[in-house]
Design a protein with these regions (language model features):
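Bulky hydrophobic segments
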Residues: 1-140
């Protein structure tokens, strides 16, 4: 059993990439929790962008999906172009949901823009991680 498993993680993140990913996932989740009035709602953010918390669900969901799955994919050795295709599919799904699917949904281009922004932020982060934050896993 000297040969490594082809299903293992081919790369391991540097400490800054791992902590940064957890921090950014936590921030996206806190933004999501701010939808309801309470401790997680930022008055400064509401003053800067008055309708922010009515659209933040799309941003948070898109960010959490792509950054969560994409980070694991990069550690598994999936090429960044495949992560880019997933980001494009997620952006297109945001557009399709907000413009074409009217069942249980009202058309809202601002929601689509927030979803695309969350996807773009996640892909930018993942591109940086792939470029600067991964090193080969010595166990494989």
């Amino acid at each position: 059993m000297d040969t490594p498993s082809p299903y293992g993680l081919r790369f391991q993140p540097t400490i800054w990439a791992a902590l940064g990913n957890l921090l950014l996932l936590g921030i996206a989740f806190l933004l999501f929790l701010g939808r309801k009035p309470g401790a997680f709602r930022s008055q400064a953010l509401m003053d800067l962008l008055p309708g922010f918390y009515t659209h933040v669900f799309n941003f948070s969901l898109s960010y959490l999906l792509l950054a969560g799955v994409g980070f694991l994919w990069l550690m598994m050795g999936v090429a960044v172009r495949h992560v880019a295709w997933a980001a494009l599919a997620l952006a297109m799904a945001n557009l399709a949901y907000e413009f074409l699917l009217t069942l249980l949904n009202t058309r809202d281009p601002v929601d689509a823009a927030y979803g695309i922004a969350g996807t773009a932020c996640a892909f930018t982060w993942l591109w940086g991680v792939q470029r600067f934050g991964l090193r080969p896993n010595p166990a494989t």
